[in-house]
C-alpha cells in the first residue's frame, strides 16, 4: 500500500534510532533541508530504509534539488543515514560496554549498525560477480568488482576543477568520521570508528564500505604516517586477532609494485573469512635454529610463504623479525633474488596473522619488487601474457587467493563466451589470443557449458598471476632455492 515517501522514511528513522514520535516534525524538516521540499508529495510502497533513502535522492534529482552526480547524491545520502547513526561517543561506549562481557557480540553489533546505516554498501556489493574454481592450489576465489560506481566524465571534470584540500589527509584518517565529503573525497557523514589502544597509541577499527569479503575490516593508526613493515607489525597483527575473536589480520607490503593502493597511512585489514591460502597445507616442514617450539613450514601455495605457529606470541614475533631482517638483506643471483639496487630496497614481507585452535599463526609472504627490461611492471608481478585479466598490484587480499578483477571483465568475458559459441566476433584485442586458445581447446562447447569454461580459465590464469608474483617457483628448483634462504636465516646471528 502506497504511503508518503518522507513520512515512511521518518517512521523508520524513529524506529531505528533514539528519536521519538515527538521528533517527527523536526526529522521531516531535516529531510526537506537535504532533498528539498519538492519531494513532499512523492509516494512509495517500499518499507526498507535504504530503498527509501535511494528514492528520496531520486525524487530530489527529479525535483532539481539534488545533483545528478553520484558523488553529490552520496553526500546527501550519507547525511540522511546519519539520522539513524548514534554519535561517535555513543557508538564507542556501546561497543566497549558490550565487549566487556561478550567481544563477539560487540563486533557483531557494530557490523550490523555499519550495514543498517549504509556505510557498508550491501546493495552495491551484491552486484559483484563472485565464484570459486578448483586449481592445483585448491579452490581460488574470483570476484569481478562491480560495487564501486564508475566515475562519470562530468564528475572527473568537476574533481579536476575542485578547490584543492588536504583535509582529511587521506581516506583512512580519523578525520573522515562525520566528514561531509566533496566531489573528490567520499561522503562520510554516517561513518563511525571504534577507538582502541595498541602500544599506548590510538588506533581505529572500521568496516570497509565496499567489502571484498565477509566483515572486511580496517585497523588504522591514529596518525597519518606511512606503511612500514617492522617487528611492531607482527605484534600488532597478533594483538588484533587476540582482541577480535574469529578475525584474521594482515598487512599489505610497504614497497611499490608489491604493496597495496594506500602506502601513505599505516593500516591493516582483517575480517571473518577463510581464504584459500589459509586452508593450503604445508608443502615441506622446515626448522629454524633456536625455535624448535615454533611449528614452521613452507606453504603449498603459488607465492613464497613461510607459516609459523605457536602458543607464544613473543616467540612468533622474534622469529618473524629474524626472517624479515634476513630477507631484507638476502640476495641469490641464481634465483633472481636481489635485496637492493642503487640504494633502493627490493625486499619486504606481506604478513597475515590468525588465531586457531589455541595457537597463533603467522604467514610470511616473501616479496621482491625488482623490475627489468623484460618485465618493466615488476619481475614478481603479473606478466604481460596474463595482464588481460589482471595487471594491477598483487596486494594482501589477492596474495591470500581472492582475485579482485576490474569491472571491464563483465562485458569482455561475455564477449569471449559468445565468441566460443560462434555467436560473435567482438572480442577485445587484449583477449584475442586467449579466446582463440579456448576455442581450439573447446571446439564443441555448448551454451550450458561456456560460462563454466571461461570462468575456469580465468581462475587458472589467476593461479598463474600468483605464480608470477611468487619469488620462488613451485618446482623442485624453486623449493631448493627457498630452502637455501631458510639456511641463510639459520646462519644469521
Curated annotation (Swiss-Prot):
GO CC annotation terms, alphabetical: cytoplasm
Signal sequence extent: none
EC number: 2.7.7.12
A single GO BP: galactose metabolic process
Key words, A-Z: Carbohydrate metabolism, Cytoplasm, Galactose metabolism, Nucleotidyltransferase, Transferase
Single GO molecular function: UDP-glucose:hexose-1-phosphate uridylyltransferase activity
InterPro entries, alphabetized: GalP_uridyl_Trfase_II, GalP_uridyl_Trfase_II_CS, GalP_Utransf_C, GalP_Utransf_N
Location of the protein in the cell: Cytoplasm
Reaction catalysis annotation: alpha-D-galactose 1-phosphate + UDP-alpha-D-glucose = alpha-D-glucose 1-phosphate + UDP-alpha-D-galactose
PROSITE patterns registered for this protein in UniProt: GAL_P_UDP_TRANSF_II (PS01163)
Any Pfam family: GalP_UDP_transf
UniProt gene name: galT
Name of this protein: Galactose-1-phosphate uridylyltransferase
